[in-house]
Each structure stands twice: as structure tokens, then as C-alpha cells.
């Protein structure tokens, strides 16, 4: 899990999802950029420059050891025993490779359709169906207890670790200690480090067996330590919430428990592909504008084959590639998956993979595959230029979030353009 809002699971988003699909993915693919949401999702984090040996200076490690000593004193006051600290922190050194990976962000990103090509590949669908068959009894019990469809749980398992194949081999405590010492997000990672020590102290796992991603996400479904403490469950009844073992039962149940506790509604889709009518008011295609499916149908918004979407509750229209490509009608369950990982691309990947595992068809509309997604530098330029001419994006951070989308839409309306909020290269060139 990859976001931290009010205790929600977190890890560096750029270290997630299709890292697990390394056998399908050629080297150097970089990151994925959802064109309308500006959230990068890494295919395979690569430390640049490649093949460089990172060596920690004696002075740097001495400062790390001094920090570690002060940290030990702080956490003793939080109830961590000397025995736990001795077992967990013995021999730790500053790992500069972890920091290099944390700093690694590709200048050029990949569009959502390339992300989905891997996230919902034929191989992943086949492996997911095999996993559903292998763990059918377990997943059926999990669905009965938590009310989360087994295909959704399997999709999370598939995107996080390729069904347990790539769970990460970095020592969690080593990684978190390094990241907590680093000043960039020190408080967040120190909180995670304390939680990891609490897990060890509770006896759920030994320090040696606590492994995962370089950013501290653990197990089959990649829980961060704080989220493990809040949401992990002992579904197999062996007395431990073991998300690290070869048996994925506890991890799968924990993912379902997490979604259930964040408001999952069984039987409600995360989203449905729709066809927009000619003359559709693109200014209404935004997350805070919701209607019932029947109300959308009255405006001509229907499924690709012309049917009305069943009334599953209030829904918004999401355009991942602006006015081109797939259009989605999204429901409250979309927000629930967002609690697991905040990137729209990830949510769509989970949702669409779960649909494919349940036997549904691929998206019917074509993506604008000829488009090039803006680079990080270009996204900042777009934000700067919009703000300078009175369409305030609220920040110049290279992330195309709701504020930037609204600014783009306002500019498009002012210019008589299609107001789809799509931050395209053509739009940037028009602003130059």
C-alpha cells in the first residue's frame, strides 16, 4: 500500500505495482503517468546511474549511528524493549542505495494505456485465474467474512507482488532506519520504523524475516508497518498475522479487511466503461459532480453497447485520457481502492484486472496511443504558464492533480476548447 492519509498504508508510489511484472517488462521503461491525474507509478525502479557502486563514507555512517543511538532512547519511552531493540537494530548501517532509489524519478513518464498493458496483461490475467482456482476455498471464505469480492482481492495481490512472486527482499528495518535518518520524509519513516519494531516485539515476525520493498512495504499485499498494525488479520488462526510466508492467506484476508473497513460495498462496481454522447458537457466530467446512472443515462451517457448502467449509487465521470480514449463512470468503491493506493492509474488497474478475472471484456474504446505524456519539467512549465495568466494551479509541483485539472479546464473554457481537463502537449504548446 502506498499512501499515508490518516494512517492509511503508504510507500513510495513509484516503487510499486508492475515492478512485480519484471519478466514481462523490458529494462528502462521508467514510470507511468496518468495523463489526467499526474501520479507516477513505477514499472521498475532503476537506480541511476546504473551499475554505480554506492559507498557510504565513514563520516556519513558515524552520523547515522549517532542518530540511531538517539532513536533508541526515544523509542524506549514508547514501550519498545531493550531486547527488541538489540535484536532489531544490531549491525544496521546507512544504506545509500535505498536513498538513491527514493530519489529516483524518471523525467519522462508513460501514459496510462501502457501501464494497463502490463497491469492487465494476458499473463497477469492467466496467473490471476490460476491463483483464484488454487485458493478458491480461502478466497471464498474471505469474501464471505469481509464482503469484498475475491476477484478484487486477487487483483490487489496481482498488482502488488504478481501473486506473491515478487514480495521484495530488502530488510524492512534497515530500509526504514535509512529513510528515517534521511531528512526528506524523516517523520513518516520514523513512524513506520517504530511500528515495525512493535510488530517484532509482538512476535508476529523476526527482524530477519521482516522483508519487503526498499520503501518498507511488506508481504504479499505490501502493507506498510502502521497499516499492518491497524488492519492485518490472523485469518488462518495460527496466532500470528503472517503476511510474509509462502501461504498468502493472512495477507489476502488483511487486504480484504482493509477495504471493508474503508467502506467497500459488495456488488457495487468500482467503475463502468461508458460512451459519451455528442455534445456532452465535459465540464461535468469531474470527481465532485455526481449523478445516479439513470440521470446520466438521461443525458445520453450509456455503456458502449447502448445500455443504461444499473443504479449502484451516485457516480462521477472520469476521463483518464481527456476527451479521447476510455470514459468511466466511477462509484464509491473507486474511492475505497484509492485508500489502498491513491493513484487513479492504480485504481483503474485494480478495477479492470478484477473485472477481467471475473470474465468481463477489455475496454472497448481505443486509447490515444499517439499522445506523448508531458515530462516532469513540462508539467511544471504548464502549471507555471497557467498560473501566470490567471488560471491558478495552486502549486508548481509537476503533479497533475485536481487543482491543475480544474485550471486546465477553466483555460480551455476561456479559449473555446473542449474542456476535458487534459494536460496535453498540444495544450502546453498553445500556452507557449
Model region roles, listed by residue range:
Residues 6-16:
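Bacterial N-terminal signal peptides
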Residues 1-3:
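Positively charged n-region of N-terminal signal peptides that target proteins for export
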Residues 55-89, 94:
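Mature N-terminal segment immediately following signal peptide/propeptide cleavage
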Residues 19-61, 362-364:
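Proline-rich, low-complexity linker regions of envelope-associated factors in Gram-negative bacteria
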Residues 21, 382-385:
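Non-catalytic peripheral regions of nucleotide-handling enzymes
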Residues 67-71, 138, 175, 254, ...:
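A general alpha-helix detector
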Residues 80-312, 325-329, 336-354, 358-376, ...:
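Catalytic glycan-binding domains that act on GlcNAc-containing polysaccharides
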Residues 374-379, 387-431:
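Short acidic, glycine/serine/threonine-rich helix-capping segments at coil-helix boundaries
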Amino acid at each position: 500500500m502506498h499512501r499515508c492519509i490518516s494512517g492509511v498504508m503508504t510507500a513510495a508510489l513509484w516503487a510499486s505495482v508492475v515492478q512485480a511484472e519484471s519478466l514481462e517488462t523490458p529494462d528502462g521503461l521508467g514510470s507511468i503517468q496518468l495523463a489526467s491525474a499526474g501520479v507516477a507509478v513505477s514499472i521498475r525502479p532503476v537506480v541511476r546511474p546504473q551499475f554505480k557502486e554506492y559507498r557510504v563514507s565513514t563520516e556519513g555512517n558515524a552520523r547515522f549511528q549517532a542518530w540511531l543511538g538517539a532513536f533508541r532512547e526515544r523509542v524506549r519511552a514508547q514501550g519498545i524493549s531493550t531486547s527488541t531493540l538489540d535484536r532489531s537494530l544490531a549491525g544496521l548501517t546507512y544504506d545509500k542505495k535505498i536513498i538513491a532509489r527514493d530519489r529516483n524519478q524518471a523525467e519522462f513518464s508513460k501514459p496510462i494505456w501502457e501501464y494497463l498493458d502490463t497491469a492487465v496483461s494476458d499473463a497477469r490475467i492467466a496467473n490471476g485465474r490460476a491463483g483464484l482456482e488454487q485458493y478458491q476455498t480461502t478466497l471464498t471464505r474471505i469474501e464471505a467474512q469481509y464482503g469484498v469480492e475475491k476477484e478484487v482481492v486477487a487483483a490487489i495481490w496481482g498488482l502488488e507482488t504478481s501473486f506473491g512472486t515478487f514480495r521484495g527482499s530488502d530488510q524492512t528495518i534497515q530500509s526504514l532506519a535509512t529513510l528515517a535518518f534521511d531528512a526528506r520524509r524523516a517523520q513518516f519513516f520514523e513512524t513506520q520504523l517504530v511500528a515495525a519494531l512493535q510488530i517484532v516485539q509482538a512476535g508476529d515476525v523476526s527482524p530477519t524475516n521482516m522483508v519487503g520493498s526498499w520503501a518498507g512495504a511488506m508481504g504479499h499485499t505490501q502493507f506498510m508497518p502502521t497499516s499492518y498494525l491497524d488492519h492485518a488479520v490472523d485469518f488462518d488462526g495460527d496466532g500470528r498475522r503472517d503476511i510474509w510466508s509462502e501461504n498468502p492467506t493472512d495477507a489476502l484476508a488483511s487486504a480484504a479487511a482493509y477495504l471493508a473497513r474503508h467502506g467497500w460495498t459488495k456488488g457495487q462496481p468500482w467503475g463502468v466503461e461508458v460512451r459519451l454522447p455528442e455534445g456532452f458537457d465535459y465540464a461535468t466530467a469531474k470527481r465532485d459532480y455526481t449523478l445516479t446512472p439513470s440521470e446520466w443515462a438521461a443525458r445520453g451517457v450509456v455503456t458502449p453497447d447502448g445500455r443504461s448502467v444499473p443504479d449502484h449509487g451516485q457516480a462521477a465521470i472520469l476521463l483518464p485520457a481527456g476527451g479521447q480514449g476510455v470514459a468511466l463512470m466511477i462509484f464509491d468503491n473507486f474511492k475505497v481502492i484509492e485508500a489502498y493506493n491513491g493513484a487513479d492509474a492504480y485504481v483503474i488497474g485494480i478495477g479492470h484486472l478484477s473485472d477481467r478475472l471475473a470474465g468481463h471484456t477489455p475496454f472497448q474504446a481505443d486509447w490515444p496511443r499517439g499522445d506523448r505524456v508531458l515530462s516532469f519539467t513540462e508539467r511544471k512549465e504548464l502549471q507555471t504558464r497557467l498560473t501566470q495568466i490567471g488560471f491558478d494551479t495552486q502549486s508548481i509541483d509537476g503533479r497533475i492533480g485536481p487543482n491543475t485539472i480544474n485550471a486546465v479546464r477553466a483555460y480551455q473554457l476561456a479559449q473555446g476548447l473542449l474542456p476535458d481537463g487534459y494536460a496535453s502537449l498540444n495544450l502546453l504548446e498553445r500556452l507557449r
